[in-house]
Amino acid sequence: MQRRQFLKNSVLLSAAGLVGPAVISQTVHAAEPSVAPVARRRFVLSQTYKLNPPKGSSGVVKLWIPLPVDTAFQQMTALAFSGNYKHAYVTTNNTYGAKTLFATWPDSQGELLINVDIDIETADWEPLKQDALKTWQAPEQIIYPLDVKPYLLPTTHTPVDGKVLETARKITGNEQDPLKKARLIYEWVSSHMERDNDVIGCGTGDVAEILKSGKLKGKCTDMSSVFVALARASGIPARELFGIRLGKANKLERYSKSAFGKADSAGVADVSGGQHCRAEFYLAGYGWLPCDPADVTKMRLAEKKSHQDADVQAVNTYLFGNWEMNWVGFNYGRDFELYPATEQGAMNNFGYPYAEVDGDPINFYDPKAFSYSYVATEQR
């Protein structure tokens, strides 16, 4: 039986999903990031899932799909989904409030279909470019809001002691200004780490392993997580935002036609493999700020340039404190349990769809094996 549900300017929450996460839903909250009035971009992200359970598998099929978080720089304005599932609903009932479309099928035999259309509006988030910090000074006494404090804590993949703390101290030295400390960490990550296209997906972001091994290579989750862990170890709240590219980079494409996202002349892009992780850090007395050291390394490799190259340095400067929003973020979840709970336990992150057949996961890193396809179309 075909089922269709449509949500506009809001999302439908399950009864369980109305319960906020205990760690983050406190009475004192950080101010939302501010975005100067700029032209907004509009995209439709169309997702097609035809789940492909492994041969011989049987049993209940469950699918968790990450949906965009609403912020000052991006909003999910509409959501529609249809398919032959038995149940499907949206929930945020997890520690990070990660917005999730959950669907189930009673058995893995036969077609397992769901189509999802997401309307998204974005605005470039450029606080440093817009000189938003020109009057900022670090408070004499730094007190973080309760919903920011969790982003100082370690997780399984982002520890803040041992080699991480040792490295952070070497990078920041005697610097006390939190913005300058964040910049030192960002510069270290973008200049010392290298992109490795052989890494599966976006990388695992296992910071302790990366630093202990001395092999400072990986992909976007690896770079972003190293930045996050080093920042937290330095007393600066930081977090990853897992998401996906949506199309052409209007501003940064002058430096690379391929590194930052692309689309055809009609604004259509196949983004099935376009997952990308970015990072944010928090300044007391101001709020959250964006950065993206991983895309510096991606551009450097794509264009076969050194870090000292003028174009690389221009990108490096822009991506500390600014994001071009031909991309959308899903959630900040790291080392956490989805809802409903998976058989496999805590997720490293939730930047990809996740599915289980009778408790066994399907390879979400391979769109063809899973299988899913994503097409983003910019509305002009």
What are these regions (language model features)?
Residues 174, 178-182, 187-277, 299-302:
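Active-site neighborhood of thiol-dependent amide/isopeptide-bond enzymes
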